Regions:
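Conserved alpha/beta-domain cores
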Residues: 24-266
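Conserved glycine-bearing catalytic or ligand-binding loops at nucleotide- and phosphate-handling centers
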Residues: 1-14
Length: 266
């Protein structure tokens, strides 16, 4: 709001106050075990966009990093980051977390996240277009640079790699071919690297329906409920006119989550 009226200003101030009260309440819970109402112990991980977020992660005693959005490394600059630049960032994060899990999502550009120097063609429906793993598989030189940096950095901490927008076993097998090439290259070059766990994001109905088969190909799943809700309910989550219809607790979404969990544990 550029010039809010008194009512709007009052509502915003109330929201700000409520948010501050929530933060203060959460601070009183820091250091306690995370146990659900039905007695399940869970770990609370942080989401970050760059290494600058690490201070807050440590301050709030997170159990690890559940999602490092690596695309922000690309979005915050005007040229492609080099392998060495990425390696140093990933290594810093891994070493700072001192053995705690760090799950790094590979480049998830496209849709609502655009980067001019990628020179991507305009699309009528970007959310359904060339994004995430589709870009990585069609532009392998970008993908390989990132994967080399990730494998190198994994020698310095508990890094896992997560691939976004996977919809088929075929995509995973293409990724595995690229990973095998990278391992061979690094070995021949005498470069130290680790063996990070590799997982995928489940964020489309196709991935849900294929989750039993996909589980056989990877080490872990992460359910991306924002996109899964959008694609399941056929609702553009960027459209404010549809806010009332965007429901992550819709029975269809909850059933899909249940299906993924059951298939992952088979």
């Amino acid at each position: 709001y550029v010039d809010p009226d008194e009512d709007t200003l009052g509502r915003m101030q109330q929201l700000k106050l409520e948010e501050q009260e929530k933060k203060e309440l959460l601070q009183t819970l820091k250091g306690r075990e995370n146990i659900t109402i039905d007695g399940k112990k869970i770990m609370l991980y942080a989401n970050i966009g760059n290494s600058k977020d690490l201070a807050a992660v440590l301050q709030n005693d997170a159990g690890g990093i559940g999602l490092f959005r690596s695309e922000f490394i690309y979005l915050e600059r005007d040229t492609f980051p080099t392998e060495e630049e990425q390696f140093q960032i990933y290594r810093t994060v891994a070493e700072t977390m001192a053995g705690k899990p760090v799950i790094i999502r590979t480049l998830d550009i496209g849709a609502d996240k655009k980067c001019d120097y990628f020179e991507m063609e305009p699309e009528e429906n970007p959310a359904m277009g060339c994004r995430a793993i589709r870009i990585c598989l069609t532009r392998p030189e970008i993908f390989k640079t990132q994967l080399r940096a990730l494998f190198r950095a994994s020698a310095f901490g508990n890094i896992s790699i997560m691939y976004p927008m996977i919809i088929s076993v075929d995509e995973l097998r293409k990724i595995k071919t690229i990973v095998a090439e990278i391992r061979q290259e690094l070995t021949e070059q005498g470069v130290t690297f680790g063996e990070p766990k590799q997982g995928i994001m489940i964020e489309t109905p196709a991935a849900v329906m294929m989750s039993e088969e996909l589980a056989k190909e990877v080490d872990f799943f992460s359910i991306g409920t924002n996109d899964l809700t959008q694609y399941t309910l056929a609702i553009d989550r960027q459209n404010p006119k549809l806010d009332a219809f965007y429901d992550p607790h819709h029975p269809a979404v909850l059933r899909m989550i249940q299906m993924v969990v059951e298939n992952a544990h088979k």
